[in-house]
């Protein structure tokens, strides 16, 4: 369907249907047409494709179009030809238009708002796109931003054929053929070195829309060019990427609607570098925020390493990173082969902004593009934050799941200045770095409390068991007292063994761990601490048995067998299943610590869930004891009521450590792991948990009498 419009005719709403072939003839007359056009194909002098839209006339010859863009569109621009065209030549390029589109009034998303409501506001003048806001605590907060200045008309360096004014009677035809992307135009205009967009990109502001455009351009280039990537192309590619890796752009990455943009950038740079051909001389392409080095290697090389020193921010402070390939590994590769490494000082922070997770990259991000025969490399990271109170993890970027993964690397050595990692490069893992945990609590006070309390606890447990041996025949004359002391002895014995294995595990933990020894220590720590809880559960069940069942009793042998089944059988089953299910996949242990893994397999739940469930059951038991002893005081004199209150308080004081209720403070340390107070209280209460057992055994004998 064809349609022709002349300069002295106004186009009415709905007069331009979807897919129409429109020819506009410019004359020296009244306003021609002002429209928001989608550029897809450049012919002579220029061609446009108009997608579906609704148009209406505005003031001074403006036409407002609300359009549904073609999926092939690569740019959207405002064009204005006013009445002034009768006295001058009217340029069609948006970058040359002197008259600006009246922006929607700002302040639409200002003021008090309703929580969780959203609104959209147009971008400032000279930019295209919208800003999205969300209301939180009755205040508008920006969440997305698509404002951009870059498009197909201005991303290239000035071309007289593109921006020259139209002469009289020049025809502009609408072309509906196959679209041409910015990447296609780039490869046509400067196929040798991709440099024809560098100047305008470097002059563009670091706003979210521009960042998204450049990321997409880099991605398209990396997928379009499969061969012939030489040093000149890599230099231009690096310069383009360097612009959006600038430290001043980091805050704007959070507003890009596509959260995958930072992942796409990292993957695109690595993919393009993989196609770099290195001739005779090593490649060294250095920009401020990206540094690429590459060379050819052979099996007779002694060893190879790349050393980077880059600024993290706008200060003069620099951090270093090194990639080392051992001679043994080099012997595995065919000759000649090439290795390439890329260092990024800021992309770690950019990934953090996109991930919205509580992790901090504490060094350079180093990418290693290696022959598939190379299975091991060593990486040395200088720490950005050199705090000794932070735990460091060696990680690799999982290119499929888009997250940092501890399975790719292992810590070899660490001090306050640097960390040495051994990593396994593969198709999934190309980029590596070190993470700093922001909330791990390392306190000398807490350490002293733990070890001093542990020593006192071990001494108290030994004293408790010694007293039990001395008075065993006197305190086990009845069946109920015998069962009660069986529970006390096993609680003390299992807690003593747990403390001993805890000390063993602490000595085995560190940057360099003995894996099999660490697995054994973790298994026994898990088993014995679970046994402590299950024996405390058995003690609680025995108290409930005494309260609820008075006249009907079970044989002593059945009760003893039941207690041992609960105390040792259940923990053994849980610990064995945990190690069998997680260790084959190397998900049983934490990195550098001999304890159950959390990040990968959530193996720690095999301890947390049973322990907290037992604490809840024991809390119910204590409540029933309080209720039972309180009933005895009803109707008695004031003196007897006071005695009952004292008796109840004493029962609570004895049962709380005996049944492990102090472990409930562990919930507080999980909810707020940054609180030093909760950690100190938890350490104090549990370090001295068994101390009362050595001195209050006689008092515990009276609890059963009180509740009957």
UniProtKB/Swiss-Prot annotation:
Extracellular side: 1-451, 509-530, 579-606, 672-674
Topological region Cytoplasmic: 473-487, 552-557, 628-650, 696-708
Major localisation: membrane
Entries under PROSITE patterns matching the protein: G_PROTEIN_RECEP_F2_4, GAIN_B
Membrane topology term: Multi-pass membrane protein
Keyword Cytoplasm assigned: no
Tissues where this protein is expressed: High expression in kidney. Up-regulated in lung adenocarcinomas and prostate cancers.
Residues bearing attached sugar chains per UniProt: 21, 220, 252, 260, 305, 313, 358
GO cellular component: membrane
Cross-referenced Gene3D superfamilies: 2.60.220.50, Rhodopsin 7-helix transmembrane proteins (1.20.1070.10)
Domain GAIN-B: 293-442
Disulphide bonds in the chain: 394-421, 409-423
InterPro entries in the record: Adhesion_GPCR, GAIN_B, GAIN_dom_sf, GPCR_2-like_7TM, GPCR_2_secretin-like, GPS
Annotated compartments: Membrane
TM segment ranges: 452-472, 488-508, 531-551, 558-578, 607-627, 651-671, 675-695
Entry-linked CDD domains: 7tmB2_GPR111_115
Keyword Metal-binding tagged: no
Entry-linked PANTHER family: ADHESION G-PROTEIN COUPLED RECEPTOR F2, IG-LIKE DOMAIN-CONTAINING PROTEIN
Family: Belongs to the G-protein coupled receptor 2 family. Adhesion G-protein coupled receptor (ADGR) subfamily.
Function: Orphan receptor.
Protein name stated in the entry: Putative adhesion G protein-coupled receptor F2P
Organism: Homo sapiens
Upper lineage: Eukaryota, Metazoa, Chordata, Craniata, Vertebrata
